[in-house]
């Protein structure tokens, strides 16, 4: 598997972990009487931990090849993914300030990654 595919899988897994953490928080808010073990073994929390683990393992694969000084800033793509996901899945509004912010983030990612041979 190429390093770029590992990076994509890491970003996807990290975003999915955040998604399932939000789902877990929503479940716990809707059912405040859940006992700690019920929370610990709830489907959303288990999926969150699973995706967190996949993200960590694939990230280690990325770091074994790419310089952390270049790879880590590219993880800011997660901010963009989560903003859009929260809007379309959780119906959270996106302000003009947020649109400007994600545009700047994406410009930064393009600037950092543009034309560099380490992406291949």
Curated annotation (Swiss-Prot):
It comes from Shewanella sediminis (strain HAW-EB3). The keyword Phosphoprotein does not apply. This is Probable 4-amino-4-deoxy-L-arabinose-phosphoundecaprenol flippase subunit ArnE. One of its GO terms (molecular function) is carbohydrate derivative transmembrane transporter activity. The chain crosses the membrane at residues 45-65, 70-90, 100-120. Keywords: Cell inner membrane, Cell membrane, Lipid A biosynthesis, Lipid biosynthesis, Lipid metabolism, Lipopolysaccharide biosynthesis, Membrane, Transmembrane, Transmembrane helix, Transport. Belongs to the ArnE family. One of its GO terms (cellular component) is plasma membrane. It is a multi-pass membrane protein.
């Amino acid at each position: 598997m190429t390093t770029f595919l590992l990076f994509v899988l890491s970003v996807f897994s990290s975003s999915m972990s955040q998604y399932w953490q939000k789902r877990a928080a929503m479940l716990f808010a809707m059912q405040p009487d859940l006992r700690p073990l019920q929370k610990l073994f709830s489907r959303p929390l288990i999926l969150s931990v699973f995706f967190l683990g996949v993200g960590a393992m694939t990230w280690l694969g990325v770091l074994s090849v790419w310089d952390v000084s270049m790879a880590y800033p590219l993880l800011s793509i997660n901010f963009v993914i989560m903003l859009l996901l929260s809007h379309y899945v959780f119906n959270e509004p996106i302000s003009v300030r947020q649109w400007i912010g994600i545009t700047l983030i994406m410009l930064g990612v393009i600037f950092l990654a543009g034309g560099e041979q380490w992406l291949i």
